[in-house]
Curated annotation (Swiss-Prot):
Its main location: cytoplasm. Binds 1 zinc ion per subunit. It is found in: Cytoplasm. The keyword Hydrolase does not apply. Belongs to the class-II aminoacyl-tRNA synthetase family. The gene is thrS. GO terms for biological process: threonyl-tRNA aminoacylation. It catalyses: tRNA(Thr) + L-threonine + ATP = L-threonyl-tRNA(Thr) + AMP + diphosphate + H(+). This is Threonine--tRNA ligase. GO terms for cellular component: cytoplasm. Keywords: Aminoacyl-tRNA synthetase, ATP-binding, Cytoplasm, Ligase, Metal-binding, Nucleotide-binding, Protein biosynthesis, RNA-binding, tRNA-binding, Zinc. Signal peptide: none annotated.
Length: 608
């Protein structure tokens, strides 16, 4: 927001004609005369739509601060579009000015607001002293930071049902200690490039696309496969939980009041479009799910109702300098699972189940999560026994944050975070209790009492964004490099088995083995190149392939192969049937997709 503050002897105005965006006004507001006034010429800007409440707070703060110095009898809010070339929507601008008028009035000031969207003739007499003409740029960030400082959260460790002061807690887990330090502002900074950025390129998963916006990636066949497998995995998880899959638009109209308020609550920077409509690219699937649920007739018998959408993509307009690798992007893939619950008991029961699901993803993905359990003080006081039961379920110490009051749409949430090589959290799964959106989006159900009620909503992402899952897996390999060979879980490895031929006359047999292994839904390829066996083995190792074996005369004759098992570093003699059984046992219950590349390495494109 841009403002120009004029301390004036008087301001007179007369309304002349409407513009297309003029607000409706009474005749009494078509003219005005104010003596001894601080006139605040205002232009609400496009960026202000991200957090209009923060803009109002800081505008009011600046006006009060200036008026304390000049001691004007009246405050006049005067909309003046000429202060900026990047204006907000008229709807947002009017609401900001109305809210500012109300807030200044609540402070005991004599405040008037000049009509928005009208051509006006005006006359003003500036007093001419050093403080009589001031220009300011109003943003929301300073006020948000100040608010946090005024009312800090309380932090402790929850270990089962025991609350332990952080200063008294003996950390046996350095990953939890790093998470605590980061959350309290004493941990690793966000400077430095994490190892996964190099690895995502080396392993031909993905890379930056210079012809696009920053934070938008291009995905190569191997990376696309890993993303798709993770998406399949989450789909299976949530459908088992009773979710109904949906698909909704990626664009939403910020002139829709419910969407505008929810977007402001979310607090992330958003992609906006410069069109006739005030459109925003979604930052999550919430809007779509809520609008789907606002239309049908729902009764208590239908609840809990669960909707799932994989957003390809969601968008957040992160600062250019903050965008890094797979961890922080402007376009990303987010599994969004929403549950609509009839009452708090049902909500807590579903929250517990979804916490179990998030814990299971850590096991299935072989990612170690550290956990932050967050709640408002009111929620904690009312539900502390239930929170302790969740602590026991988790089975290890977690960081507990108690907020003095609710600042967002949620009253309680649990966040799971992997820790990267540099000691910084990668936020992954989450479950959140939303106590606002049911009413805001007019989602109702008919209760057993015959009355309409608003449901409580659970937001859950069982893995977090797909990109951050891959980020976590790659960072884990860097952390454990001194302990074991880096690799992805077998079911996520783009190539699970590589067959290496000794010579040209072994290719037919290698192809027979390929056909047999491939028929069992195992991703297998053949290194048929005219290279030494040693070089082929080294190349397979750089691709982190879980199982490698060589086909020569002896193997062809005996049917027994010396298989290099990457996970253990051992060479194990086994038949093809034994190899197939081991892999199928290891990947049981996990999704499968076929090899995303030509089976013969000699025909492949190198994407890096």
């Amino acid at each position: 927001m841009r403002i120009l503050l004029i301390h004036s002897d008087y301001l007179n105005y007369n309304v002349k004609n409407k513009t297309p965006v003029a607000e409706e006004i009474e005749d009494a507001k078509k003219q005005g005369a104010f003596d001894e006034s601080l006139v605040v010429f205002t232009a609400v800007e496009k960026d202000d739509e991200n957090n209009p409440q923060g803009i109002v707070k800081n505008l009011v703060k600046e006006v009060i601060k200036t008026n304390d110095q000049v001691k004007a009898e009246n405050i006049v809010l005067y909309p003046y579009a000429h202060l900026s070339s990047s204006l907000s929507s008229p709807k947002v601008a009017v609401q900001v000015l109305k809210d500012a008028e109300e807030a200044l009035d609540a402070e005991g000031l004599n405040v008037k607001r000049v009509p928005f969207g009208w051509y006006k003739a005006f006359e003003i007499s500036c007093k001419g002293h050093p403080l009589s003409e001031l220009s300011r740029t109003i943003t929301a960030e300073e006020e948000e930071e100040e608010e946090v400082e005024k009312k800090p959260s309380s932090w402790s460790i929850l270990d089962g049902d025991k609350i332990i002061d952080i200063d008294d807690f003996k950390f046996e887990n350095d990953q939890l200690e790093k998470l605590v330090s980061y959350e309290l502002g004493t941990g690793a900074s966000d400077a430095g490039e994490p190892p996964h950025v190099k690895l995502m390129r080396e392993k031909e998963l993905c890379d930056y696309e210079s012809a696009s916006d920053v934070g938008n990636l291009k995905w190569f066949p191997k990376g696309r496969l890993v993303r798709d497998l993770l998406a399949d995995y989450v789909y299976n998880l949530v459908v088992d939980q009773g979710a109904m899959p949906i698909e909704t638009p990626i664009f939403y109209d910020l002139d829709n009041e419910a969407i505008n308020v929810h977007a402001a609550k979310f607090g992330e920077r958003q992609y906006r479009t410069d069109t006739k409509k005030n459109l925003m690219l979604r930052f999550a699937c919430c809007f779509g799910a809520f609008r789907v649920m606002a239309d049908p007739f729902i009764t208590w018998k239908n609840l809990p109702a669960k909707l799932y959408e994989l957003s390809t993509y969601s968008f957040r307009f992160e600062k250019k300098g903050e965008v890094v690798g797979l961890k922080r992007l402007r376009a990303f893939t987010m599994p969004d699972f929403h549950s609509f619950c009839a009452d708090m008991n049902s909500t807590l029961e579903e929250f517990s189940k979804q916490t179990d699901m998030c814990i299971q993803t850590g096991v299935d993905l072989d990612v170690n999560y550290e956990i932050i359990f967050r709640a408002t003080k009111d929620f904690y006081d009312e539900n502390k026994d239930w929170m302790y039961s969740i602590g026991k379920k988790i089975g290890k110490p977690v960081l507990l944050e108690i907020l003095p009051e609710r600042k967002h749409y949620w009253s309680c949430k649990i966040d799971f975070a992997a820790i990267d090589y540099l000691g910084r959290p990668i936020e992954n799964p989450t479950v959140q209790i939303d106590v606002e959106s049911g009413k805001r989006f007019d989602i109702t159900y008919l209760g057993e009492d015959g009355k309409e009620h608003y449901p409580t909503i659970l937001h859950c992402s069982p893995t977090g964004s797909i990109e951050r899952v891959i980020c976590s897996l790659l960072e884990k390999t860097a952390i454990e490099l001194d302990e074991k060979a880096p690799m992805l879980p077998t079911w996520l490895s783009p190539i699970e088995v590589r067959i290496i031929t000794v010579g040209e006359d072994h290719k037919d047999f290698a192809n027979e083995l390929y056909d047999k292994i491939n028929a069992e839904n195992i991703r297998v390829d053949v290194d048929d190149r005219d290279e030494s066996v040693g070089k082929k083995i080294r190349n397979a190792a750089t691709e982190w392939i879980p199982y490698i074996f060589v086909v020569g005369d002896n193997e062809k004759e005996s049917g027994v192969f010396s298989v290099t098992v990457r996970e253990t570093g051992e060479k194990v003699d086994m038949t093809v049937d034994e190899l197939i059984k081991e892999i199928l046992d290891k990947t049981k219950g996990m999704p499968y997709r076929g090899l995303p590349l030509p089976k013969d390495i000699s025909t492949r494109i190198n994407f890096q």
